[in-house]
Swiss-Prot record:
Protein family (similarity comment): Belongs to the Nudix hydrolase family.
Function recorded in the entry: Probably mediates the hydrolysis of some nucleoside diphosphate derivatives.
Organism: Arabidopsis thaliana
Superkingdom: Eukaryota
Protein name, entry field: Nudix hydrolase 22, chloroplastic
Gene expressing this chain: NUDT22
Cofactor(s) of this protein: Mg(2+); Mn(2+)
InterPro entries assigned: CoAse, NUDIX_hydrolase-like_dom_sf, Nudix_hydrolase_AtNUDT22, NUDIX_hydrolase_dom
GO terms assigned for molecular function: coenzyme A diphosphatase activity; metal ion binding
Pfam (any one): NUDIX
Keywords attached to this entry: Chloroplast, Hydrolase, Magnesium, Manganese, Metal-binding, Plastid, Transit peptide
């Protein structure tokens, strides 16, 4: 997504603008550009994938021309929908996923999902998914910024889309029971505070990462916001409030570039040469059995 945020937003005249604080925030975010150091151009990304998959796939006799498409991470987008609470604080809309879902069931997440072919940009993806999941009319959301991409554990390239809900009263949540169990909102600034927060180290793709857990209580319900959702919200709050969190987000020695991450990930496909020979049906998915891929790199079958 290289176009400006306004490309995915309705015209300003369609919104009932709220406080001067929200107006100032919208102006601030419209000029935001993700840091070059934390991402890379899609052309460079594709070249990296082509090179890394070429080295891996030639070992198992796959057609090289198919590698960039078959093994490239799919795109997704999530909506960081901000609005002004009754006390004047910024709040963000979250969902509790249905307990019947096959992945991340019952977890707190941001509205969003995978991109579809007809989606013109990441803003369309995020707002479309939000409408499908919680009944949030895209015309109510003013898309103002796109953050740098995050890679999920299921190898989705997730783009956080920041939108402003100028009139909270115009939104009547209608969760889709097949996907969402509950709709909630939380104070946005909590993701910069070292309160009701803990962290643990987890291994992922051969590296150790700090995973943050935020405990949040509203009414009679207790929620835990963690993992990728917490990472995205920490980053988004850092951008919005223009200050770092009051805790260590990631240990310096645990950081590494996304380019190295991509190269290392696809280098893991080399063991497919031996594993493929032991699989009874090597023609599933045309080339590689789906369960072999999931075993090696955790690719979701969905």
């Amino acid at each position: 997504m290289k176009s400006g945020a306004s490309a995915a937003s309705p015209t300003a005249k369609s919104f009932n603008f709220g406080s001067s604080r929200l107006l100032a925030l919208a102006q601030q975010l419209r000029v935001y550009k993700p840091p070059l150091s934390s991402s890379f151009d899609e052309r460079e990304e594709l070249l990296a994938y082509k090179e890394s998959t070429r080295k891996s796939i030639t070992h198992v006799g796959f057609q090289e021309s198919m590698a960039p498409v078959r093994f490239r991470p799919k795109k997704a987008a999530v909506l960081i929908c901000l609005f002004e609470g009754d006390d004047g604080d910024l709040r963000v809309i979250l969902t509790k996923r249905s307990s019947t879902l096959s992945t991340h069931s019952g977890e707190v997440s941001l509205p969003g999902g995978k991109a579809e072919e007809h989606d013109k940009d990441d803003g369309i993806t995020a707002t479309r998914e939000a409408e499908e999941e919680i009944g949030l009319d895209p015309s109510l959301v003013d898309v103002v910024a796109f953050l740098e991409p995050f890679l999920s554990q299921h190898l989705l390239r997730v783009i956080p889309v920041v939108g402003i809900l100028w009139d909270r009263k115009a939104f009547n949540p209608t969760p889709n029971p097949a996907e969402v169990e509950a709709v909630l909102d939380a104070p946005f600034e909590m993701f910069l505070k070292d309160e009701n927060r803990r962290s643990e180290e987890f291994d992922w793709m051969g590296e150790k990462h700090l995973v943050h857990f935020f405990d949040y209580k509203t009414g009679d319900s207790d929620y835990v916001i963690w993992g990728l959702t917490a990472r995205i919200l920490i980053r988004a709050a850092t951008v919005v409030y223009q200050r770092p969190p009051a805790f260590i987000e990631q240990k310096p020695n645990l950081k590494y570039s996304k380019m190295n991450q991509a190269t290392r990930l696809y280098g893991w496909l080399k063991p497919l040469a031996n594993l493929h020979e032991s699989c009874e049906n090597g023609r599933l998915l045309g080339h590689v059995p789906a369960y072999c891929l999931r075993y090696l790199v955790g690719i979701s079958s969905r």
